From Swiss-Prot:
The lineage of its organism: Bacteria, Pseudomonadati, Pseudomonadota, Alphaproteobacteria, Hyphomicrobiales. This is Isocitrate dehydrogenase kinase/phosphatase. Disulfide bonds: none annotated. It is found in: Cytoplasm. GO terms for cellular component: cytoplasm. InterPro entries: AceK_kinase (IPR046855), AceK_regulatory (IPR046854), Isocitrate_DH_AceK (IPR010452). It catalyses: L-seryl-[isocitrate dehydrogenase] + ATP = O-phospho-L-seryl-[isocitrate dehydrogenase] + ADP + H(+). One of its GO terms (biological process) is tricarboxylic acid cycle. The gene is aceK. The keyword Transport does not apply.
């Protein structure tokens, strides 16, 4: 971000400006022509590497422009543009691959079968990206394009191997440090806010700084601070932008003082841009709360600092309960996160020797879910046909269900839907699977799973963060934990609605509870756009749905299957509007008008009290 601030309202971004800034440049046709014309294998390898690297450079240049555009949209309070930028960014990688693949197939069809050309060309590419920061990302792009052309199996290529190797990443390169003594004063916080360099005015920076300093002082109390004790505040040299909000992220460090070891306190300063200026909306100092704010259930952040390895490492240090791979994904680097997640799953198996077995909870009617006991992830496939317990008259088929999982990946998940990593043509060792699971996969997933000697090959494989299914959680939780979970279930349903997502199968078994006790929707075979659903008022004929598209809010509690009367009452008392047609119709009108409903990304208790 810039280091200066203006006192004028930012100019909205024009449609043509966004179009120009996010347009992918055409492939280098001169290089393509030279590639098509040469018969020399060495020249073909060299030119293929140059063509692909040129396409990657085009992609990477656009992807790095988008965070600055997101900052400009935040400063201009142009919320529809923030949503549009997220959609553009998430589809950019695939669009660039898809732009080049047909040209290579048409001009050099032997690429799909020539087994000698690819290794030689790969060596040329690795030599060309030697020393570049984004070398691993360029190599990921290369592998994605190769799989599209060759229809090869997906494998977690080690992008940190060979000539793309890098030293162990430290977040120090992306941190700005302020050294002071306790107590942390309003003036120190005001300096940090001012150094963020927004180009729009603050409503009351000094007042917000005083409130933030007070919140930080309260959060430090369990660490036994002493007046005058040295303290270091490290803030990422990056703005994080998403939808209506922005945040500054870092940590507070108290040194080892003999009787106390070094102490670290995560820090997130959440910002809003209101009509009368920037405000500090909340201060988060708990790792679990940061994890919720940076959850993969939300839209990705646009981070203005290009050093994605250091940013991901910083986020991992602040939120160690979340695997490193998901830290890449939450700042928009899905393809690096995809590799990291599969590498973590394989490493978990090597370390624990555990086998993949059916996931705890109820048997899925559409999906087969499986996991290892100590793994952080759940893997899924879609059945060829639903089980006999399937609720609806018509099953759209495997490809349509996968389309819905992809849809959820590509939208703002509003803090209440798990992201999906979807792999194609993945091969996993047969020994990783428990015999009962192996039999079920091969019997119920004939169109998806095949046995290839000592391995299972998956046409598709969905990976999600592991949750505890809501009914299983309620069966083992305390009364207070259960009450909090059903209230959070209502928040989840509201947030889904704000993202134009309606789950027509409102069974509580489709929702789960995370390690930080947040409730999320995780099964997507029954999701529909809320704007396409007909909301029925009281007096309609009985039955939850008509042809799967008519929703009767007054029947919501029956659909959720919350059997405990006290929990049903807690849900109804906390969210009475969810049982009323007016609420749902109002949300539909807002979505159709292009409005961006507000979504709460952190506990209301962390908002500054003015």
């Amino acid at each position: 971000m810039t280091a200066t601030a203006s006192h004028t309202r930012a100019r909205p971004l024009g449609a043509s400006e966004i179009e120009h800034a996010t347009r992918i440049a055409e492939p280098d046709f001169d290089l393509l022509d030279a590639l098509y014309r040469t018969d020399d294998p060495d020249d073909q390898a060299r030119l293929l590497a140059r063509v692909v690297l040129s396409a990657f450079d085009n992609y990477y240049a656009v992807s790095r422009r988008i965070p600055a555009l997101a900052q400009a949209a935040f400063e201009a309070r142009d919320w529809p543009v923030t949503v549009r930028l997220s959609k553009i960014r998430i589809g950019l990688y695939t669009a660039c691959i898809d732009q080049l693949v047909p040209l290579l197939k048409a001009g050099l069809p032997e690429l799909t079968t020539d087994e000698q050309l690819w290794p030689t060309a790969e060596a040329e590419l690795l030599a060309a990206i030697e020393g570049r920061y984004e070398a691993d990302f360029a190599f990921a792009f290369w592998q994605s394009l190769r799989r599209k052309l060759v229809s090869d199996e997906w494998r977690p290529v080690s992008y940190d191997a060979g000539s793309t190797a890098r030293r162990t990443t430290s977040p120090a390169a992306v941190l700005k440090t302020t050294t002071t003594t306790l107590p942390i004063t309003a003036e120190v916080i005001a300096g940090i806010l001012g150094d963020a360099g927004f180009r729009v005015p603050w409503r009351d920076r000094d007042g917000d700084a005083a409130l933030a300093a007070q919140a930080i002082e309260t959060a430090l109390e369990p660490l036994s601070p002493r007046p005058g004790e040295p303290v270091k505040i490290e803030i990422a040299d990056a703005g994080f932008f998403r939808n209506r909000g922005a945040c500054l992220v870092g940590r507070i460090q108290l040194r080892d003082r003999g009787d106390m070891p070094m102490r670290n306190l995560p820090l997130l300063i959440a910002l809003l841009n209101e009509k009368d200026g920037l405000v500090v909306d909340a201060v988060l100092t708990d790792s679990d709360e940061l994890q919720y704010a940076f959850s993969s259930t939300l839209a990705n952040y646009h981070a203005t600092n290009p050093r994605y390895h250091e940013l991901a490492r910083l986020l991992y240090e602040l939120m160690p309960k979340r695997p490193l791979g998901t830290q890449y994904s939450c700042i928009g680097f899905h393809h690096l996160g995809k590799v990291a997640v599969m590498s973590e799953i394989l490493a978990e198996h090597r370390k624990t020797k555990e086998r993949l077995a059916t996931a705890p909870g109820f048997k899925g009617t559409v999906a087969i879910a499986f996991t290892m006991p100590s793994s952080a992830y759940v893997l899924k496939i879609i059945r060829d046909h639903p089980t006999d317990d399937y609720k609806f008259d018509y099953f759209d088929g495997l490809d349509e269900v996968l389309r819905k999982y992809n849809l959820v990946h590509e939208i703002d998940r509003a803090g209440s839907m798990l992201d999906n990593i979807i792999y194609s043509n993945v091969k996993l060792d047969r020994a990783m699977f428990a015999p009962e699971l192996l039999d079920e996969l091969l019997e119920a997933g004939i169109g998806t799973v095949t046995l290839d000697r000592g391995a299972l090959v998956f046409r598709h494989l969905i990976v999600q963060i592991k949750l505890t299914p809501l009914p299983l959680y309620l069966a083992n939780a305390s009364a207070a934990e259960s009450r909090a979970a059903v209230i959070n279930l209502g928040d989840c349903i509201k947030n889904n609605a704000a993202a134009d997502i309606f789950n027509k199968d409102l069974d509580g078994r489709n929702y789960g509870v995370s390690r930080i006790r947040k409730v999320y929707l995780f099964d997507y075979d029954a999701v529909e756009p809320l704007t396409s659903v007909t909301v029925s008022r009281d007096g309609a004929a009985p039955g939850e749905f008509d042809n799967g598209m008519v929703f009767r809010p007054q029947e919501m509690l029956e659909g959720l299957r919350i059997d405990d009367p006290g929990l049903r009452r807690a849900f109804r008392d906390a969210h009475p509007e969810l049982m009323q047609a007016d609420y749902w119709e109002g949300m539909q009108r807002a979505l159709r008008d292009g409005k961006v409903p507000k979504v709460m990304n952190y506990p209301a208790s962390r908002r500054l009290q003015r």
